[in-house]
């Protein structure tokens, strides 16, 4: 089954064709970074207009690279939530129209579920496993029971990790997008130049949560307080110290979730999963296997959308043409985290 996937949830116009859920026939991503870089962040209206301009040429390019025509397509999958409303609307409307005109089955998928599905394109994974999704808009720690069943354990209580990278990079004039430029600078810096604090939560129910507002404040407004005077205040050292703390914030709930669930595997996905320090930090973990998608499948892409759509379509699922875009998803229930907390023995000493 050849599934054409369309992803326009943010600022990338992406189209891919995937056969039988794992064989990537084509993967086209039209990036808008040069257009948003002058604003040091994504401008939603500009993103929507670029999607309108690029969606048809990107579909044509994906078909050409796969050496296929629309007659060879067996189904269409598209992201409908969460994301920027205008951006989602472009991809969803195009997908509906194309599916209707070609009499093809159509499925609207969740962008976050698709990120986890990206790992299944290249790896043979068994459910359930612990999931960590870290991107510019989300942070989620969960147990993934199936391609459409995600049990949330924790999430960000304020800012997403990718957003923190962008904000710090923008403040210091490092460039845009912040994730890659900070990683590059950090390679020449020393993380010991500053010791930024990890977040501390008060009250119950936050064992698997993350927070980045405090780190952003420390790096941007309180650098003097946390700086090690033995080190020169360079862009490289600032980037290295910030990156080390930002990654540690993610590692702590991931390790806790693996410990508490007893599951042997974790999938780490989303744009921040492309970060080399994050990948290296878990490479030597003895108690679990951490699986990452290839870097090209960490950032927004349509391969993950097509792969997820295939799983729905072979199950016989279809979306109604009345399905709408949703900028936000329903609040994740954290009953999973509460359940695990109740199961942990009060006498046991947590390792993380």
UniProtKB/Swiss-Prot annotation:
Signal peptide: none annotated. GO terms for molecular function: iron ion binding; N(6)-L-threonylcarbamoyladenine synthase activity. It is an enzyme of class 2 (transferase). Pfam families: TsaD (PF00814). It comes from the Bacteria. Its EC number is 2.3.1.234. One of its GO terms (cellular component) is cytoplasm. SUPFAM superfamilies: Actin-like ATPase domain. Its cofactor is Fe(2+). It is found in: Cytoplasm. It catalyses: L-threonylcarbamoyladenylate + adenosine(37) in tRNA = N(6)-L-threonylcarbamoyladenosine(37) in tRNA + AMP + H(+). Keywords: Acyltransferase, Cytoplasm, Iron, Metal-binding, Transferase, tRNA processing. Binds 1 Fe(2+) ion per subunit. GO terms for biological process: tRNA threonylcarbamoyladenosine modification. Fe cation binds at residues 111, 115, 300. Substrate binds at residues 133-137, 166, 179, 275. Belongs to the KAE1 / TsaD family. HAMAP family: TsaD. PANTHER family: TRNA N6-ADENOSINE THREONYLCARBAMOYLTRANSFERASE, TRNA N6-ADENOSINE THREONYLCARBAMOYLTRANSFERASE, MITOCHONDRIAL. Required for the formation of a threonylcarbamoyl group on adenosine at position 37 (t(6)A37) in tRNAs that read codons beginning with adenine. Is involved in the transfer of the threonylcarbamoyl moiety of threonylcarbamoyl-AMP (TC-AMP) to the N6 group of A37, together with TsaE and TsaB. TsaD likely plays a direct catalytic role in this reaction. This is tRNA N6-adenosine threonylcarbamoyltransferase. The lineage of its organism: Bacteria, Pseudomonadati, Spirochaetota, Spirochaetia, Spirochaetales. The gene is tsaD.
């Amino acid at each position: 089954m050849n599934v054409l996937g369309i992803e326009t949830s943010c600022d990338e116009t992406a189209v891919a064709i995937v056969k039988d859920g794992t064989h990537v026939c084509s993967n086209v991503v039209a990036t808008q970074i040069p257009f948003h870089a002058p604003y040091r962040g994504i401008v939603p209206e500009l993103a929507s207009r670029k999607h309108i301009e690029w969606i048809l040429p990107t579909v044509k390019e994906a078909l050409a690279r796969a050496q296929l025509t629309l007659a060879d397509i067996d189904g269409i999958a598209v992201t409908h939530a969460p994301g920027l409303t205008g951006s989602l609307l472009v991809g969803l409307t195009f997908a509906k129209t194309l599916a209707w005109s070609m009499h093809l089955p159509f499925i609207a998928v969740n962008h976050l579920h698709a990120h986890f599905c990206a790992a299944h394109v290249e790896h043979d994974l068994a459910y359930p496993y612990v999931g960590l999704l870290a991107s510019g808009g989300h942070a989620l720690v969960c147990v993934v029971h199936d391609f459409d069943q995600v049990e949330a354990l924790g999430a960000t209580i304020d800012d997403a990790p990718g957003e923190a990278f962008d904000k710090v990079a923008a403040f210091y004039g490092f460039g845009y997008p912040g994730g890659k430029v900070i990683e590059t600078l950090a390679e020449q810096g020393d993380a010991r130049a500053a010791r930024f604090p990890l977040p501390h939560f008060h009250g119950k129910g936050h064992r698997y949560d993350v927070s980045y507002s405090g780190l952003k404040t420390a790096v941007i407004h309180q650098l003097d307080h946390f700086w090690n005077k033995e080190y020169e205040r360079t862009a490289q050292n600032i980037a290295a110290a910030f990156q080390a703390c930002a990654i540690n914030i993610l590692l702590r709930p991931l390790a806790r979730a693996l410990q508490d669930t007893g599951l042997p595997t974790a999938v780490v996905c989303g744009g921040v999963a492309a970060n080399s320090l994050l990948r290296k930090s878990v490479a030597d973990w003895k108690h679990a296997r951490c699986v990452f998608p290839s870097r090209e499948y960490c950032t927004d892409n349509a391969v993950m959308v097509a792969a997820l759509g295939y799983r729905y379509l072979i199950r016989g699922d279809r979306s109604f043409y009345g399905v709408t875009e949703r900028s936000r998803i329903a609040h994740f229930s954290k009953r999973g985290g509460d359940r695990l907390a109740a199961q942990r023995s009060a006498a046991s000493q947590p390792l993380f």
